[in-house]
Amino acid sequence: QRLAGGDARSGAHVRKALAQLPHTRLINGYGPTENTTFSCCHTLTADSLNHTTSADSPPIGRPIANTQVYVLDDTLQPVPIGVPGELYLGGDGLARGYLHRPDLTAERFVPNPFYGKAEGNREQGIGNEEQRTKNVGLGPCKAEQLLYKTGDRVRTCPDGVIEFLGRLDNQVKIRGFRIELGEIEAALLSHPDVEQAIVRPWQDDTGRQQLVAYVVEIREQGLGNREQAEAE
């Protein structure tokens, strides 16, 4: 048995692994560090690769034991089966937050609108902030009263299997590391000579990814050194 995690699986690589390891059970493990790495799992087979209608990536499967998953819209309402939404995670594996980052903790670890209701009930949702606040009280929330907002775009299939569709923001993964492109752009823009900046992932012919940054320099009034030298 082999478990794979850290990044979205490539269908081509999965097919190659299945062909070379016919007697090995391959499991696609999904989950962020904020929920103790593995939150969902899916056994990879040739049929599972034909299951998904999204990009060339196999499904991430169903939640593991003592884990709750919800596919919600931007008002924390459950979306219908087959409709894309954002994946929220809860359960025993949920972290307490980010060390010394209360701002990021408040942004990503949100009150669980389903706390106190039947576990995994996808029919209920609480849409406004006042109701959500009352639902968990005014004091500090316990782990079971929170959900982690993953930023991952997914959808649930009729059989309950979850498909990963991509990110809802500019976060990318390169060699297993999560990278916020906006943070790099902000660092570039802090340079006094940079007027505009944009960062994008780039993939070469071998499939290897790296980051590429494009910047526009601030041009001072008058001739620069090169123009002055040419004029002289």
What are these model-derived regions, one by one?
Residues 1-12, 20-29:
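Conserved helix-loop-beta element of the AMP-binding
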Residues 126-128, 135:
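Acidic/polar hotspots within intrinsically disordered regions
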